[in-house]
Amino acid sequence: MTTIEDIIRIAVNAHDGMKDMVGNPAVAHVLAVGLMGKNPLEQKAGFLHDVVEDSDITLDDLRAEGVEEDVLIAVDLLTHRPGMSYEDYVKNIVISRNETAIQVKLNDLHHNLHRAELALMTLDTSTRERQALLDEILSIAAMHDRAERYIQRSIVKDR
């Protein structure tokens, strides 16, 4: 069984040298999403949610490191595969009924929205660049809203 510290080490190493859309270390995002988790399972999945998608690390590599199967299942669901539409990707998470993956995806969207808003406020950019960033913020916000509504509808259907 891996500790939170082991998982953080894996995430930090996987994102070493990577930058986000405004030049900040990409690892800051996965650390933030992990810290948003309400329990160790959500935290571990949050720290690892972009590892398979953004690096050469595979689910089998994580398994070999001792990452628990519950975490691997969530990370697998949270990995956006090439060729899959974003809408289908989110639907797969919701359809899975995997509470960990669903909560981590909501945390991910929430943090993406927050950092895009911060970037818009702090970047010294041209009007065109600001508009592009604003468009991205609105797109993230719309995805967040659609995902939350879809999840809520799915939860209500189960009751």
PLM regions with names:
Residues 1-159:
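Active-site helical microenvironments for divalent-metal-assisted chemistry
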